[in-house]
Structures are given as structure tokens and as C-alpha cells.
């Protein structure tokens, strides 16, 4: 699961090598799922009708949906631990979809379909913080992004 691992990184429990391994697994999950970013909540998703209601289908909401709110926090951890190139590459799909959809949606389904509120402050906040962190890194390196 993505969220507990990210929390372990935030808590300082993973080595740099372990963070790299986790990130590679997240990218592989994105590739296998066909979802747009590392905001993927889980992979593989629970099968069709495992749950009733809003999560009855795979890649919907918390059943494998793609949340910038989650992925953006992983981006922050990548930056904090020196994985700048990875963070820059992995934030792009999140920024691109905000621009394309003209909003900060809660989550995205298969095919990058935006869902939930288009004004989700959690998404806006984590992206803004990650962008600020990238700019701070660039300034410290006397570089531009």
C-alpha cells in the first residue's frame, strides 16, 4: 500500500536505497495499472463487486483511484531525500492534468478521468508544496527548473 510506505518515509524509517526501491515499485504499479501517476492508491485493486457502493469497481475512489493528494506527498518525500530527477519527472503528470482539466480534482479514474471535487484543496496544497520544494532546491543549486 502506498500510504503506509510514504508515512514510513516521512518518519525516517526507510534508507535511501529502500526509498528508491519503493519508488520503482510505485512506477511499476502505475505501468501495470495504466493509471496516470504515482497517486495510485493501491495495486492491484480489489476485484469487481468486492465492495458495494462507490468502490464496487476497480480503479474507482480508494479502490485503485489516482489521488494527487497521495502522490504529491510522495513527491515531497522524493525531494526531501534527494531524488530530484525522479520527483520532477513524476510530478509532471499531476501538473499536466491540473492544467488540462482546469482544476484540482480529488482523484482520477481509468483513462485519467477527473472525479470528485474540481476544487480539492488537498491536491492544490500538496502540489504547491512540492513545487516550492523543487524551486528551493533549484535556488540552492543555483539552477532553474
Regions found by a protein language model. Give the residues of each.
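Solenoid-repeat scaffolds in large eukaryotic assemblies
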Residues: 19, 86-87
Amino acid at each position: 500500500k502506498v500510504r503506509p510506505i510514504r508515512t514510513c518515509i516521512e518518519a525516517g524509517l526507510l534508507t535511501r536505497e529502500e526509498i528508491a526501491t519503493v519508488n520503482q515499485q510505485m512506477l511499476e504499479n502505475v505501468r501495470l495499472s495504466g493509471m496516470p501517476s504515482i497517486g495510485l492508491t493501491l495495486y492491484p485493486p480489489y476485484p469487481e463487486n468486492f465492495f458495494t457502493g462507490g468502490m464496487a469497481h476497480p480503479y474507482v475512489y480508494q479502490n485503485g483511484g489516482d489521488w494527487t493528494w497521495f502522490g504529491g506527498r510522495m513527491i515531497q518525500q522524493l525531494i526531501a531525500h534527494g531524488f530530484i530527477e525522479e520527483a520532477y519527472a513524476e510530478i509532471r503528470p499531476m501538473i499536466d492534468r491540473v492544467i488540462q482539466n482546469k482544476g484540482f480534482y480529488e482523484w482520477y479514474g481509468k483513462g485519467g478521468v477527473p472525479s470528485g471535487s474540481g476544487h480539492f484543496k488537498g491536491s492544490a496544497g500538496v502540489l504547491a508544496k512540492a513545487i516550492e520544494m523543487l524551486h528551493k532546491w533549484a535556488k540552492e543549486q543555483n539552477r532553474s527548473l
